[in-house]
């Protein structure tokens, strides 16, 4: 067994480090009134509660649970994705629509209502600054899109002007699964 020679300097350093631990732990705690974001568990749903038939597939965008549910046309594939959701109920259009167009590397253009609030906003070409991320699936409602995002902090939060945003890798997956004509319900 080795003989450990501890000096007074080692002893003081050890005690000092121990005294710092509680302060660093307190720095990591959340205030009691904070709310959770990016919830990691979702309840599964049944497509029959929303649609009379699967058609080319079905999507439910749930603004309360902040999740997107996808069912394939044959009903064998069911997936749940965390999403960003509209900031307010006024920005949330609810009801039935469908995917009418899809685009890899979409460009973003501010809507007329956004330009009223932010007249300096300019269109953004595809790339890392684009708020639509890497893929976009346009709905039959003007200016409503299921898309990706480069800002992953938005997922699980109320952060959009009406769209539903997914992590870029998840929108790429959904983009491959959901063809044009996929039914969409926003609740």
Spell out what each predicted region is:
Residues 20-21, 180:
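Residue-level marker of structural boundaries
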Residues 23-27:
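Sec/Tat signal peptide C-region and signal peptidase I cleavage site
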Residues 8-9, 67, 165:
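Short, cationic motifs built from Arg/Lys/His that form the positively charged side of catalytic pockets
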Residues 1-18:
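N-terminal secretory signal peptides and thylakoid transit peptides that target proteins
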Residues 30-113, 125-128, 135:
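Cell wall/extracellular polymer interaction/catalysis modules
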Residues 54, 88-95, 107-187:
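Exported/periplasmic cell-wall-interacting domains
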